């Protein structure tokens, strides 16, 4: 627990109403969306501005108090779980859109702004912020930046880092710096902006961001391709890209996922096929119509049993909603849902899907697979019960093999969820000892007292695991 004098110091900075040391308050921020990770912080602090963040960090750095920066807690790698106590920083007061600059096509926001609020705000001005993580109704832009979040539109439009032009940051020692700006070109010094994107709160605190916008696409169309053979569906993904078409969305759902999603969303998805590709294209009408026709022909040539084009925006929106509800639908089946994001080059989608199915059979565990097939980002999802230790051990072994297979296929252990505590034991598989050492050097340079999100990225326990006991 924190000393009373330190608590009083925090209160003097942010006000009594913004320091919570109650059991209920601390319990609320002791876990995130990751199953079976939980640890109590000593206090929850809600700063009102960047200067207050800086003053809080100065105290924490002096007394070596762990700091866990938290958005809405939607991350799936135990990235915000306060494993070593200390304080959780929340941004309920720092949640304002500061400026929409139509001349420079930028939006400036505080870290606590909800992602969907950004998307809606710029849509009113016929502008477009493309990153669309499935959690966008809840997640904050600060969380998106720290995790470098992706989304359904990542294939065509990229991920969060492709839209962050500048940041306001507070370093662990309390220094406030600004990186980047409203510039199309800027090569002055190291690219600190990109260094902090995806750093998972281990290097400092993001308080503001300047984000790039693009013009709103003129139109869009959505289609479904249905397959009796899951491998043919996977091969169709590579074939579409090989035909020089980059759709806005190219999603994959296997049969178990389809059945659960249809029961949940009830939009008329066919449940008697082995796989579905959900494909969307946007842009000028002539380009959209041409590409949809081409992709339909490609899917048919890859033995799709049917290709269906949404008749109107309402039907298209229902299909998008169904895909975004996959995790919610699957999570209803059993008490514990392990959602992973092994990612491979899109040319390796078919062998990766085959491997996931073989591994699930080998360990006798249910794994449903869906995800952003167009960029190789698959979500093998296991429905289990953490109270069943024997089954959990099998799940642990299965995911270890899935990660190893992704690496074997020139992929990665995580495409968008991040490393956090859950994936830390696997990071060396991807980077090697030398890569880990390079990252530790960066960490030491910015945060020599290791106050920022300790217990994440760098594994203290070499045991491979997907969950830990409370």
Predicted feature residues:
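Noncatalytic alpha-helical scaffold of FAD-dependent oxidoreductases
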Residues: 1-470
């Amino acid at each position: 627990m924190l000393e009373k004098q330190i608590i009083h110091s925090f209160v003097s900075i942010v006000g009594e109403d913004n320091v919570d040391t109650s059991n209920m308050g601390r319990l609320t921020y002791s876990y995130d969306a990751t199953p079976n990770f939980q640890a109590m912080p000593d206090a929850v602090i809600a700063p009102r501005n960047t200067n207050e963040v800086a003053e809080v960090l100065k105290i924490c750095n002096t007394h070596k108090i762990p700091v866990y920066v938290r958005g809405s807690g939607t991350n799936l790698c135990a990235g915000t779980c306060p494993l070593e106590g200390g304080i959780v920083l929340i941004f309920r007061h720092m949640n304002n859109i500061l400026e929409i600059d139509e001349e420079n096509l930028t939006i400036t926001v505080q870290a606590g702004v909800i992602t969907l609020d950004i998307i809606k705000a710029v849509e009113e001005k016929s502008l477009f912020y493309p990153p669309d993580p499935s959690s966008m109704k809840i997640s904050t832009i600060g969380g998106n930046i720290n995790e470098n979040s992706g989304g359904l539109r990542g294939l065509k439009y990229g991920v969060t880092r492709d839209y962050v032009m500048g940041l306001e940051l507070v370093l662990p020692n309390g220094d406030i710096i600004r990186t980047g700006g409203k510039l199309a070109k800027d090569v002055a010094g190291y690219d600190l902006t990109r260094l902090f994107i995806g750093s998972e709160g281990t290097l400092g605190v993001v308080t503001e961001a300047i984000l790039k916008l693009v013009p709103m696409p003129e139109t869009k169309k959505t289609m479904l391709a249905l397959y009796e053979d899951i491998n043919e569906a996977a091969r169709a993904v590579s074939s579409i890209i090989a035909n020089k078409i980059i759709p806005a969305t190219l999603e994959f759902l296997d049969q178990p996922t389809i059945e659960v999603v249809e029961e949940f969303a009830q939009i008329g998805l066919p449940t008697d096929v082995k796989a579905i590709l959900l494909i969307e294209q946007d842009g000028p009408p002539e380009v959209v119509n041409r590409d949809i026709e081409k992709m339909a022909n490609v899917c048919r040539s890859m033995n799709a049993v049917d290709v269906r084009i949404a008749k109107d925006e309402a039907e298209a929106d229902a299909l998008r909603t169904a895909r975004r509800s996959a995790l919610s639908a699957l999570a209803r089946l059993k008490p514990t849902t392990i959602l992973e994001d092994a990612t491979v080059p899109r040319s390796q989608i078919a062998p990766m899907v085959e491997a996931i199915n073989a591994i699930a059979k080998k360990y006798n565990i249910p794994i449903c697979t869906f995800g952003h097939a167009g960029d190789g980002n698959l979500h093998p999802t296991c429905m289990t019960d953490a109270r069943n230790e024997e089954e959990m051990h099998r799940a642990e072994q299965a995911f270890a093999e899935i990660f190893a297979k992704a690496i074997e296929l020139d992929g990665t252990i995580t495409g968008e969820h991040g490393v956090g505590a859950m994936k830390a034991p696997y990071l060396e598989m991807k980077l090697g000892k030398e890569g880990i050492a390079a990252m530790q050097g960066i960490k030491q340079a910015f945060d020599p007292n290791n106050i920022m999100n300790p217990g994440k990225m760098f594994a203290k326990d070499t045991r491979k695991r997907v969950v830990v006991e409370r």
